[in-house]
Every structure is written in C-alpha cells, then in structure tokens.
C-alpha cells in the first residue's frame, strides 16, 4: 500500500518499511578523555570498527526489506540553494555559541569554502578544531578567545548523532522536533529543522507536534507509539513533564488519531536516561523491561476532553494495564537479564532492553546480551543479532540508533 503521507508510524512493531540512520563519522574521532562528560560519552569508540558494526546493522535492515536513509544525506539534500545554505551555516555557528568575533568570521569562511553539501554537513557534525582555523592576531582576539585559549575546539563535535532516535520523533503522520536535555545534543535538532522545512520530499509536508524552540526538554527515546490509539512517553532524566503536556495538547489538537497517552515516571539518572533504555515493545503482547524500574514506576493515563488534558494515576499491575490499553487478552513483560540482578544490570547497561522491532516478533538486538537474548528466543521471538562492541560505548542500542519514517499498519 502506497502511503499518502511521507511519515507514517502508528506502532512500535508494524513492519518497518523506511528508517533513518546516521553512520558514525569524524565526530567520534573528536572525542577526548578530558571532555567526555561534556559530550555525554563514557568512553571513546574506535571509529573504524564502529562504522563496520553500523554498516552491518544497516545491511541487516536491508536484508529484511527496509529502505535505509541517512541523516547526513537528507540534511545535505535540504540545502537546496545558496540562500538556504548560508542560513544553515549562520544558524549552526550561532547555536554553537561561538563568542569571539574573529573566530566566528574564520569559521564562516571555512564552511562557505566547502562546496559539496554532504561534505559541509559532515564537517558541521564533526566539529571544528581551533588548529583548523587561521591564527587570529592577538590584537583581534576578544576576551572569550583569550579565556578559552586551552580548549581545543572552536565548535564542539556531535558524537551522539548516531543515536538518531532522539533529536526528533515520528508520531503517526507527524514529527516532534525536540528540545533536548543538553546543549551538546540540542544542536543536533538543527538538521531535523532543515529536513522538515526544506527537503524536497519532507519539507513543509509533515505536521509538527513539538518545536525545538520550546524551552522545556523532550527526547525521542522517551516517545513510543504503542498503537494507532495509544502513545507511551517517559518522564526521565532527559524529558520534562511540562514538555509532555505541550506535546500531548498538540497531538490531540492536530487529530493525528491518538486517543490516550501513558506517561511513565521512573528513576532520573543516566543509567535509565530514556524510557526506551528500560522498556520496548517486541510483539503484539510482549515487552522487554528492566526489572530495576518496576518497583518505583508510576504510570499516568492522559486523555484530552473539552480542550483540556485529563490525567489520572494508574494503579495495579503494569502488564494488566498494557493489555487493557492495547486490546489484547494478556501482556508478558520479559525482564532484561532474567531474574539475576547482576546480569540484569550488566545487560541493561549494554542496552539489552533497547530493541528495535522490525515486524511483530522480529527484533534487532546486540549479540552481547546473551542472557536476555536467550530469554527472548525462548518466548518465540526471532532475533537479528548484530555486533555492537564499539557502538554500545555511546550507551545506546538498535532502537536508539534508528528513526522509523514508515511502518505498515497493524
């Protein structure tokens, strides 16, 4: 069936037809031990192996009939004329918070001299080292240039970009262009802005249900489409309750078809940074879950009536609640690491709960999470196992690394 909308995602498990990835690039080689925390990394992946792993991930998707798009290509295709190109460069520099006037001018000249659009996009993703710029005479240096003289970057890299799930989220026929938790990652949403404003296929053709100019934060790892009627959102380290309220009002007002939202409130820390690091849907009636969140988890049911949100805390068993809202007889929660506390902690850290479902009961996983994978297989799920020894160093799994653009309806 040919879709009339360029974005069509009404479930987490419908057969995946089209997906957007980002192949890790030079931004990974601009990670430094001294600045890992600033850039939201715990370790430095080996780029060559990370690219091989990512290419194998993309090929595994193609083998299942999925069309693979790349963020870097879509962004490059969105720079359709010189005016848009220069506007993009100026916004990029402005959002990078470059304060020295001479530095700003040198960066602009460097970027304007890159004539190929894809090369330009990849350079903006990689970041700019001060050593790449011409030496600024002391007489032209501003106070900022002098104070930050030991910091090696004129513009920081964006090493988290291969986690394409977070800067924006596809919801039904719409898109949530997110305002992200950290300044480091919020710059990533600029590419989505240009894709959904200027791209020949997507520009101006997709309803916006959240805008990056909002002041409260939300990330795509906390936005899950459970069915054509029900969304799940996480109140997490990276997503505010206030953002969720804004998102939901917009979704309901634009009549995208959703009738209810389940808001999950859970521990606020890096280990559980998004809902999809602890909870993903793998079949009509099955979910992965990290057992450590179950005790403190609170779930709120949100509906929209008479131009207002109606919020009610849900009591009782999570599996029963999910079954009721999905219209199935019973839901099974499959615990990451099984009943072993050590295995659960280790495999959740390595994204054992962060699965990408490409059809009902067909799931992409990291091969390293052997205990969780064995449990999933024992439940009748088909697993597509990928290597992720380098990719996982960024603390994200197959769902984190993918943004569906089109799924078949269930």
From Swiss-Prot:
Xref: Pfam families: ADI
Catalytic-site annotation from UniProt: 400
Gene3D superfamilies: Arginine deiminase, L-arginine/glycine Amidinotransferase, Chain A
Parts forming coiled coils: none
A single GO molecular function term of this UniProt record: arginine deiminase activity
Location relative to the cell: Cytoplasm
InterPro entries noted in UniProt: Arg_deiminase
Major subcellular site: cytoplasm
Alphabetic keyword roster: Arginine metabolism, Cytoplasm, Hydrolase
Biological process per Gene Ontology, one example term: arginine catabolic process to ornithine
Name assigned to this protein: Arginine deiminase
Entry's family note: Belongs to the arginine deiminase family.
Keyword Translocase included in the entry's annotation: no
Pathway given in the UniProt record: Amino-acid degradation; L-arginine degradation via ADI pathway; carbamoyl phosphate from L-arginine: step 1/2
GO cellular component, one term: cytoplasm
The reaction(s) this protein catalyses: L-arginine + H2O = L-citrulline + NH4(+)
EC number, UniProt record: 3.5.3.6
């Amino acid at each position: 069936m040919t879709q009339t909308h360029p974005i069509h995602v009404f479930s987490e498990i419908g057969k995946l037809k089209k997906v957007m990835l980002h192949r890790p690039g030079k931004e990974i080689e601009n990670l430094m031990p001294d600045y890992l925390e600033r850039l939201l990394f715990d370790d430095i992946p080996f780029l060559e192996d990370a690219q091989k792993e990512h290419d194998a991930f993309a090929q595994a998707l193609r083998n299942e009939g999925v069309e693979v798009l790349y963020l870097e290509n879509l962004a490059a295709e969105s720079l359709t004329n010189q005016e848009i190109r220069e506007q993009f460069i100026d916004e990029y520099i402005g959002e990078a918070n470059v304060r020295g006037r001479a530095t700003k001018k040198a960066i602009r000249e460097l970027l304007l001299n890159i004539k190929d659009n894809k090369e330009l996009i990849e350079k903006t993703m990689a970041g700019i080292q001060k050593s790449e710029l011409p030496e600024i005479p002391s007489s032209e240096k501003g106070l900022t240039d002098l104070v930050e003289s030991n910091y090696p970057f004129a513009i920081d890299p964006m090493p988290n970009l291969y986690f394409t799930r977070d800067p924006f989220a596809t919801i039904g026929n719409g898109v949530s262009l997110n305002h992200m938790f950290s300044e480091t990652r919020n710059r990533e949403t600029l590419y989505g802005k240009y894709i959904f404003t200027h791209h020949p296929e997507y520009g101006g053709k997709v309803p916006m249900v959240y805008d990056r100019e909002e002041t409260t934060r939300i990330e795509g790892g906390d936005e899950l489409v459970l069915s054509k009627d029900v969304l799940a959102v996480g109140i997490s380290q990276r997503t505010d309750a206030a953002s969720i309220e804004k998102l939901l009002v917009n979704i309901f007002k634009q009549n995208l078809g959703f009738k209810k939202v389940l808001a999950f409130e859970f521990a606020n820390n890096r280990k559980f940074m998004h809902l999809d690091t602890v909870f993903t849907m793998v079949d009509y009636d099955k979910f992965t879950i990290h057992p450590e969140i179950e005790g403190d988890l609170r779930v709120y049911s949100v509906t929209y009536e008479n131009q207002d949100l109606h919020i009610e805390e849900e009591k009782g068993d999570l599996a029963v609640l999910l079954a009721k809202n999905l219209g199935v007889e019973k839901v099974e929660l499959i615990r990451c690491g099984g009943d072993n506390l050590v295995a659960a902690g280790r495999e959740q850290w390595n994204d054992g709960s962060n699965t990408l479902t490409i059809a009902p009961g067909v799931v992409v996983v990291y091969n390293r999470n052997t205990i969780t994978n064995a449990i999933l297989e024992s439940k009748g799920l088909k697993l597509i196992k990928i290597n992720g020894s380098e990719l996982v160093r960024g603390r994200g799994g197959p769902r984190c690394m993918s943004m569906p653009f089109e799924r078949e309806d269930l």
